[in-house]
Amino acid sequence: MCIRDRYKKLPNNHDKVSLIEKLQLDIPDLYNSYNLKQRKSILEDLKNRLDYMDNYHEDKGNNNWQDWFKNKQWIFGSDVVQILDKRRTDYNNIYDYIIKSYDGFVDLIEIKDPKINFWAQSKDHNNYIPSVDLTKAITQCANYIHCLEKRINDKDIAVEIGNILKPRCTLVIGRSNNWTEEHFEAFRILNSMYHNINIITYDMLLKRAQKLCSIDSSET
């Protein structure tokens, strides 16, 4: 029986009010449950894509990585509240994603291929060092931040995308599913070198999002 028919069959106003009050309590719970189910399905899709990552490209072809992350801002964490449609703030640079953080300021997300080698093939003085491709990606992020900061007093840009103040960039690149403890130590040291760039692998992104969904599930 649909809600409308159920409402009509109620004998008195008191019962009708009780039904309305119950629905007002249940609808948010139903929405949260549905939303959580959708997110878990998306994370399962991400896991499958990583299992068959040779079938997908960074920014070319159908269903590439940059396209896949559109409209999935929640996967980058609770700090990200919106992925903006605008990707260009000048003639020279096209950003993967310009995002608005929870504090209203603008940050960046750069999506690279998970197939990229994170570490160089050989160590330097017995230390793991970034691969050439990772170094290039970090340099690109630093350049994007610099170019964005130059527009900090541009009122037109502020109207279009929001406030620019000490922008940060999240770089999603490579895999860490087969790392050793030594790799993770090197990763922590590498990330500590950059104040406005946060490097994260696809596996770390997936694991963090799964943990967020697990927390949400325990609260519903």
Language model segments and positions:
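Short, small-residue-biased leader/transition segments that mark boundaries at the very start
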Residues: 1-3
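Interdomain/boundary linker segments immediately adjacent to catalytic/signaling cores
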Residues: 7-59
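Acidic-basic catalytic patches of nuclease active cores, encompassing PD-(D/E)XK
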Residues: 49-90
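Active-site metal-binding core of divalent-cation-utilizing nuclease and nuclease-like domains
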Residues: 79-107
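Conserved catalytic cores of phosphodiester-cleaving nucleases, focusing on short active-site segments
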Residues: 97, 105-120, 144
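A solvent-exposed, charged loop/short amphipathic helix patch at secondary-structure junctions
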Residues: 114-133
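Acidic, metal/cofactor-coordinating or nucleic-acid-engaging core segments within structured domains
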Residues: 128-164
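Polybasic (Lys/Arg-rich)
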Residues: 174-220
